[in-house]
Amino acid sequence: MHRWSRLLGLLPAAGITVFLFSPGVSAKHAQGSDPGALAELRQAVNVELEASRTDKSIWTYRESNITPEKNAVYTTIETSQGTLRRLIELNGHPLSPQATEVETHRIHNYVSDPAAQAKARKAAQHDDAQATEMTKMLQDAFIWTRGGETEDLLTLNYRPNPDFDPPDMQSRVMGIMAGQMIISKDSHRIRTLRGKLSDDVRIGWGLLGKLDRGGTFDVERRMVGDGRWQITETHVHIGGHALIFHTIGQQEDDVKTEWKPSTAHTLQEAEQQLNAGK
């Protein structure tokens, strides 16, 4: 539910999970890293992994999602059984009565479909497992150095580790990212992760497609209440082309606001609350 284990998994590009690792990847230690920066990274990662394991809090929030195709606003309610969200605005306008009815039926059909819920849970577990494997490899995939520092925040800079041996296309994309991680000094929580493709990524030697150098991502996390940290903003702008005619990549800005603890313990309760607020 927007824990650290999901953080880097939120950066898909062109159908490729930007930070996706195979569990058996072999990587050489990043010899060029600053030992102090590595120590800060390890501490922050350990804190995030522990919080991801123990934090079972559930939330409700308003989500604005902008892509080239649409500008959508949702109300989202988390439960211990899963998450529901209801579309409430589209392209700057409230839903029509007909569209509202479609949303009501869509949500009810999902709540009434155990197979669909099981599929969603399985996908989430798969994403979490991949993200956990990736997290453990951060110190090897990049060279880390200390950047700026304020009273409250520490910035770590990262760049590709030339000794990292990517086993597949997904980790190859990761291998050319460079950027910053900003850590909250008092809690050792990761506040910001941003990066940029430092080179083009050619798929199938460029015959199948290419992701363009300069593509960026920015994931922001904040404390939303009771010491809990959540992803509040995700911005992904990665472009490219597949074959000759098709545009690939991702252009998305997702912002979550109005965080409150969720009082819905089941999907049925979340459905009732979403319907009451429609």
Question: Predicted segment positions?
Answer:
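Structured extracytoplasmic
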Residues: 27-177, 186-191, 196-214, 220-225, ...
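Bacterial N-terminal signal peptides
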Residues: 10-20
